[in-house]
UniProtKB/Swiss-Prot annotation:
Gene that specifies this protein: rsxC
Record organism: Shigella dysenteriae serotype 1 (strain Sd197)
Name of the protein this chain belongs to: Ion-translocating oxidoreductase complex subunit C
Cofactors demanded by this protein: [4Fe-4S] cluster
Gene3D superfamilies assigned: 3.30.70.20, NADH-ubiquinone oxidoreductase 51kDa subunit
Main location: membrane
Keywords carried by this UniProt record: 4Fe-4S, Cell inner membrane, Cell membrane, Electron transport, Iron, Iron-sulfur, Membrane, Metal-binding, Repeat, Translocase, Transport
GO cellular component, one term: plasma membrane
Length: 772
């Protein structure tokens, strides 16, 4: 009893929701054995006959090829294609293929030579001694793909399964009407199919191997049972006929009771499924060493005189196969590649046979009925009841029609297997599968565009990050390469900072002078003497380096004297307006006096060392002397009228007096050394004398009209008087040194006499004013 229950549980099957029972129409083609078809004159081999990218071409136009020779290289998920016969490559160009869009794809066109010569074949009869990776690579390089309709590369599928596969399922259901390719293959080649199953089991090492076959194939079932009579590792499961029990998810649930998760794969639950035709192709690739160059194709339909199953070479035009089967087309003949529910209508008959071509259906006008007009959905829910994937086709229809991609995705449109059960039961004749296919294509295009945008954004962000890193590295290099100050520069900087700190410390100590006491100026005097010594040393260095040819310009000296007078006036005015509360710093006064004395000595020494190369113009000297005398008279008058209330700073007066004395000595020395070599033009002298008289008259008039309220600075007057005396002495010396050959101009003498008279009058007037 326990063994009976165990056997019952072992052979138990489950049923899925939905499904339909359309007319099978399989008896038209499953009664005749497989047969060969004569070779076509031309073969068109598309480079992409599988899910994934097309391979890389390894032939060119004009090449001679043999049957089984690779036309492309298979790398990664790229599956190679092989020459179906021997011949010559005449073209490599786009050609329409078996696709609902009828778009052209790159194809290799071969003209057959009729010899059908194979490449050297190397079979692995001892495949059990081969490593798993070697077998998978051989299957992949021999171009084996899923022949049940998906076209997924078998080698990639086996590689992805790895060691987690517990159940290997062989799909022999072949549930769609009209199609009998797998049925006939199992009847005629059952032993080869089982051998291919054993190779797959050797690669995957599953715990159990299940063959699922519908009960409408009695001959195939009997042939498989005969082959599996002595095998205990492979179980044959006969399931009820129901469409679409051949779907991967549906058959997995029927045989194991496990459901593939949404968005997942069967390998996630430890299940891997392969088709009967794929198992046969694996056997031929591994044991016989033959790449996939042909497959079984069902030729059926009332428009075909000799329906049946044939071995069709890949790349054979559909027209060639139909004509060989006695095709009798009508006026509006339709040819479907695949079954009536999941197949596609061919745009023309030059489309080639590919790896996923399992049936060519040529129905008559009465066989499928007249096409019905599409009507509005009445929401009868018949499509939802028939859906084997538990979807809501009516809702997906509305979302697809309204371009509501997000809602269609939310309602799991990706789980639709496009079986056509919903369209079969729809009373409104709505081609639901067409809407779903279009919606899936649009969603795939949107996701592809989003992926490109994300990749572009990632590249942009990576570029920005790289630029930022390069910028930071560049700045770091610049910082590290910056020139550091030398040791001597650091010492100089440190010394300067020390001096500044010392001065700041001295400035922060207030100087307090008590009444009746004299401050202790010993430190100040010592510092002053040190500075004086330093200044003398610097002056000696400068004198040694200066060129002996340096000439002192008396005009520059006069300008400097004028600038000194202006500064003196400004300081006196500021001191006069200053508040009496301001204290006088004795240290600063001493420093200024020392600086003035040093400048005076410097000027005297420069005057002594200057060479007398510069020539002095006696005419200019005469004019300057006259101007100086006029300014002296003006200053004397201003001093007489000056108010006695203005205070005088003795320090500044001493400084200015010292500077004036030095400048006067310099002028006297220059005048003494000047050579009167330049001849005097009597006309220029007359002009200058006239100008001097005019200036003298203007000065007398200004003095007469001057207001007595104007205050005169006695210090400035003293300085200017000293300068005037120096200039007068200079003029006298120049006149004394003049050569006797120079003629005396009577006009010049007259001018001088006039100037003397004016000066005498002015002196008398000033004397009277002073006495008053």
């Amino acid at each position: 009893m326990l063994k009976l229950f165990s056997a019952f549980r072992k052979n138990k099957i489950w049923d899925f929701n939905g499904g339909i029972h359309p007319p099978e129409m399989k008896t038209q083609s499953n009664g005749t054995p497989l047969r060969q078809v004569p070779l076509a004159q031309r073969f068109v081999i598309p480079l992409k006959q599988h899910i994934g990218a097309e391979g890389e071409l390894c032939v060119s136009v004009g090449d001679k090829v043999l049957r089984g020779q690779p036309l492309t290289r298979g790398r990664g998920k790229m599956l190679p294609v092989h020459a179906p016969t021997s011949g010559t490559v005449t073209a490599i160009a786009p050609h329409s293929t078996a696709h609902p869009s009828a778009l052209a794809e790159l194809s290799v066109i071969i003209d057959a030579d009729g010899e059908d010569c194979w490449i050297p074949r190397d079979g692995w009869a001892d495949y059990r001694s081969r490593r798993r990776e070697e077998l998978i690579e051989r299957i992949h390089q021999f171009g084996v793909a899923g022949l049940g309709g998906a076209g997924f590369p078998t080698g990639v599928k086996l590689q992805g399964g790895g060691d987690k596969i517990e159940t290997l399922i062989i799909n022999a259901a072949e549930c769609e009407p009209y199609i009998t390719a797998d049925d006939r293959l199992m009847q005629d080649c059952a032993a080869q199919v089982v051998e291919g199953i054993r190779i797959l089991a050797h690669i995957l090492q599953p715990r159990e191997i299940l063959i699922g076959i519908e009960d409408n194939k009695p001959q195939a079932i009997s042939m498989l049972r005969a082959v599996l009579a002595d095998s205990h590792d492979i179980s044959l499961r006969v399931i009820p006929t129901k469409y679409p029990s051949g779907g991967a998810k549906q058959l997995t649930y029927i045989l194991t009771g496990k459901q593939v998760p949404h968005g997942g794969r069967s390998s996630d639950i430890g299940v891997l499924m392969q088709n009967v035709g794929t198992a046969y192709a694996v056997k031929r690739a591994v044991i016989d060493g033959e790449p996939i160059t042909e497959r079984v194709v069902t030729l059926t339909g009332e428009a075909i005189a000799r329906p049946g199953n044939v071995w069709a070479r890949l790349g054979t035009p559909v027209r060639h196969l139909l004509n060989d089967a006695g095709f009798c087309p009508s006026a509006d003949q339709m040819v479907i590649m695949g079954g009536p529910l999941m197949g596609l209508t061919l745009p023309w008959l030059d489309v080639p046979v590919v790896k996923i071509t399992n049936c060519l259906l040529a129905p008559s006008a009465n066989e499928l009925g007249e096409p019905q007009e599409e009507q509005s959905c009445i929401r009868c829910s018949a499509c939802a009841d028939a859906c084997p994937a538990d979807l809501l086709p009516q809702q997906l229809y509305w979302f697809s029609k309204g371009q509501q991609h997000d809602k269609a995705t939310t309602h799991n449109i990706a789980d639709c297997i496009e079986c056509g059960a919903c369209a079969w039961v729809c009373p409104s004749n709505i081609p639901l599968v067409q809407y779903f296919r279009q919606e899936k294509a649009e969603i795939a295009a949107i996701r592809q565009e989003e992926k490109r945008a994300a990749e572009a954004k990632a590249r942009f962000e990576a570029r920005q990050a790289r630029l930022e890193r390069e910028k930071a590295a560049r700045l770091e290099r610049h910082k590290s390469a910056a020139v550091q100050p030398a040791a001597k520069d650091k010492d100089a900087i440190a010394a300067a900072l020390a001096r500044v700190k010392e001065k700041q410390a001295q400035a922060t100590q207030p100087i307090v002078i008590k009444a009746g006491e004299r401050p202790d100026n010993s430190a100040i005097i010592a510092a002053r003497e040190a500075r004086k010594a330093q200044a003398r040393a610097k002056q000696a260095e400068l004198q040694q380096t200066n060129d002996a040819a340096t000439v002192t310009d008396p005009r520059k000296t006069a300008v400097e004297a004028a600038i000194a007078r202006a500064k003196a006036r400004k300081l006196e005015q500021q001191q006069a307006n200053a508040e009496p509360e301001e204290q006088v710093d004795p240290r600063k006064a001493a420093v200024e006096a020392a600086i003035a004395r040093a400048k005076a000595r410097k000027l005297e020494q420069q005057q002594a060392n200057a060479e007398p190369e510069e020539q002095v113009d006696p005419r200019k000297a005469t004019v300057e002397a006259a101007i100086a005398r006029a300014k002296a008279r003006k200053l004397e008058q201003q001093q007489a009228n000056a108010e006695p209330e203005e205070p005088v700073d003795p320090r500044k007066a001493a400084v200015e007096a010292a500077i004036a004395r030095a400048k006067a000595r310099k002028l006297e020395q220059q005048q003494a050394n000047a050579e009167p070599e330049e001849p005097v033009d009597p006309r220029k002298a007359a002009v200058e004398a006239a100008i001097a008289r005019a200036k003298a008259r203007k000065l007398e008039q200004q003095q007469a009209n001057a207001e007595p309220e104007e205050q005169v600075d006695p210090r400035k007057a003293a300085v200017e008087a000293a300068i005037a005396r120096a200039k007068a002495r200079k003029l006298e010396q120049q006149q004394a040194n003049a050569e006797p050959e120079e003629q005396v101009d009577p006009r010049k003498a007259a001018v001088a006499a006039a100037i003397a008279r004016v000066q005498a009058k002015k002196a008398a007037q000033q004397k009277v004013v002073n006495e008053d």
